[in-house]
Amino acid sequence: MNTPKSDNYLSELRKVIWPIEKYENKKFLPMAFMMFCILLNYSTLRSIKDGFVVTDIGAEAISFLKTYIVLPSAVIAMVIYVKLCDILKQENVFYVITSFFLGYFALFAFVLYPYPDLVHPDPETIESLSLAYPNFKWFIRIVGKWSFASFYTMAELWGTMMLSLLFWQFANQITKTDEAKRFYSMFGLLANLALPVTSVIIGYFLHEKTQIVAEHLKFVPLFVIMITSSFLVILTYRWMNRNVLTDPRLYDPALVKEKKAKAKMSLIDSFKMIFTSKYVGYIALLLIAYGISVNLVEGVWKSKVKELYPTKEAYTIYMGKFQFYQGWVAIAFMLIGSNILRKVSWLAAAMITPLMMLITGAAFFAFIFFDSVIAMHLTGILASGPLALAVMIGMIQNVLSKGVKYSLFDATKNMAYIPLDKDLRVKGQAAVEVIGGRFGKSGGAIIQSTFFILFPAFGFVEATPYFASIFFVIVILWIYAVKGLNKEYQVLVNKTEK
């Protein structure tokens, strides 16, 4: 017979493991399912897009796509989104954008992917143009495989539009503050399970023993899963609008108050803010350094993955495994990150990310630069060759850098805003989002693409020493910024405590 004490213990344990009340499951579970489907597509797209571009165009093309196609496309997509919001209800905007992605996936799956010779220009023409105009050869090669470039762009936009914008806007609109404290952490845990699930799906359908479709159409089942997943997102969203938003226990427009708009700053105002406030400048430097250092290692790593796994199928299966490890490591860091922040100083917690990046980056580049020496010493000790070891260390570096991003890096960055006065906190955060966000995400790609334009004879093999040098300079600047910010942070914290 259960005692009241044991009942209380079980009740508290349930709240820790599953902090959702029974009646809230009607709201929470469909939202979690929507997020799972969106992230299932996102992680599948991330694996496939690189497989197509890296093996058919070249790893060098990724930096050009990010800089000259994805970035302008994201701006155009946001302009279209704002226009749609002016003329349609929010619910219909969601249907239009999701249906657009669904339609593109269907077009790619059944027209562009199965018939590349019909939609792409003659390869000989592309090659002759590349030789005639070497400084623009990567632009020409991208045009030569334009359908894969469009797929890469749509894959990037899926994450921006469907997850960052539409899902979280819907979640923020219908979730009360007390619900958000319990719902959002659970969303993070459940969402990261989509990554290992993606790995299993990719591994099964692209395995050489799986013979569902013709060999040259191996990716079609994955596209069908993405189309089905997109359709389920639309159905779930519609069901929630009809059944959850009409339930007064779960949604009351009067209680879900309109949130104050974030301070938005122009590019010029953001630069002024960062150059006039040393404190805000340090925070921006953290974000820029993280984005550039990740991109510099990632580009070189993907070129090495292509050497080890030269076919689309093998490359995509490997990237699926990468998603598997990334998902579990992200969950682990989410669970232990808060404990680290409670037990160590801000400086120690903030220093973990750049030091981890420095150590793993140094190991990765060492295996590339000294591959013959390493091969000589490790022959007979390890079954893997230096290329496989370099790829493995590159994967570890990427997994850890993305794992710490959402737990330690973002947490320490956001903690740094707390001691600032309200005006500087709001404006400073807006300035950092504009400068740090833009230059962090595209900085590495701009460096790489500019290098390949100026030195057309270079690929990643020849350019790696230069990118490695830039990487180490950036990480050292990052460590300097953390130390500088810590001094300023401690002064402000001590002031507020007094």
Swiss-Prot record:
Q: Where does ATP bind?
A: 436-442
Query: What are the cysteine partners in each disulfide bond?
Result: 37-85
TM segment ranges: 34-54, 68-88, 93-113, 148-168, 185-205, 219-239, 280-300, 321-341, 349-369, 380-400, 439-459, 466-486
Q: Which residues lie on this side of the membrane: Cytoplasmic?
A: 1-33, 89-92, 169-184, 240-279, 342-348, 401-438, 487-498
Q: Which UniProt keywords apply?
A: ATP-binding, Cell membrane, Disulfide bond, Membrane, Nucleotide-binding, Transmembrane, Transmembrane helix, Transport
Q: Does the keyword Cell membrane apply?
A: yes
Q: Name one Pfam family in it.
A: TLC
Primary subcellular site in the record, as a coarse category? membrane
Q: Where in the cell is it found?
A: Cell membrane
For this entry, the protein name equals ADP,ATP carrier protein 1
